[in-house]
Amino acid sequence: MLNELHENNNFDQPADPVFVIGLPRSGTSLLFNLLSLDIAHRSPMYWEIMHLMPLAKTQTARKRREFKTNTELKLAKTIIPKLRAIHTIRATTPEECQQIATMNIRSFVYMCMADVPEYVEYLKNTSFDSVFKWHKKFYQALELNGKPTRWLLKDPSHIGHLPQILKEYPNAKFIHIHRDPTESVASFCSLTKNVRLAFSKKIDTDDIGKTVIDFWNHNLTKGMEDRKSLSSDQIVDIQYSEFVKNPLDHIKNTYQQLNFDMNIQTENKIQKYLEQDKNILKAEHRYTLDEFGLNQKDIKGQFKEYMLNYDF
């Protein structure tokens, strides 16, 4: 796959993307899933990320890869029993970009899997130019099977790499969802703990807490500075606490600000999605800060400026 993409330099520029950004566990998945109901939006399916090449040209080829991917996911859920409650993944559901970055050996996925402080520092300081060159190639390859109106993309770590994104996608737009870090940080610590338990016999939960707040505060601080260069029609802010009260209205307002068209079919799909699962806005994944040697004072100390700016 890598060689095939590397040697092909005749790709067209991909369709302009819109990126959902924000701290992990801040409502990005709910927002992403609702936006994906718009037929104008195209996101990679999980099976496409895991088994892209050679391109699946027939329905039979796609079904085989879906089956293979679902089999792999069943194994993953056996290894990480709480994965289903933390983050729903299926072969045919839209998926975020983090697995693409793993191919470039620059992904926060690896810091979830193991206690690797040197690697965390590497992620904070290394260039991500090659990550997004590869990222762009990936979507160019997907477009060989058809170009969408717009790419809908998501990855929590994108918040720390806005200049690199804009270098490859100069017309990119962003939807930044904000949630109180005292809630989102605890949730990501719990996710990290459950992933790491699959790879380590012993884990240090206090170390997980320290690593998580340091790494994500670094990314967020960088992102908040970098986004100052964006115009008002390039980025929209959403408060999670308000969004969950009326997701559809917030999405309609977001479309207006980004000059996207909202049709009645998309409105109906979003409403149906929300009505079909009345528990969608209720967390099944339980966690507390003190499990990870943290308290609200620690979070407020690390994220002080951000929390003041967004009234948390």
Where does each model-flagged region fall?
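PAPS-dependent sulfation machinery
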Residues: 50-151
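Glycine-rich phosphate-binding P-loop
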Residues: 20-37
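PAPS-dependent sulfotransferases, especially Golgi type II membrane carbohydrate sulfotransferases
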Residues: 1, 8-9, 115-133, 142-146, ...
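Conserved phosphate-donor/acceptor-positioning beta-strand/loop module used by diverse small-molecule
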Residues: 154-155, 165-190
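Short His-Asn-centered micro-motif
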Residues: 21-23, 152-156, 240
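Post-Walker A helix-loop "phosphate-sensing" segment adjacent to the P-loop in P-loop NTPases
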Residues: 37-47
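Long amphipathic N-terminal alpha/beta scaffold segment
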Residues: 1-23
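Flexible loop/turn segments at secondary-structure boundaries
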Residues: 158-162, 182-185, 244-247
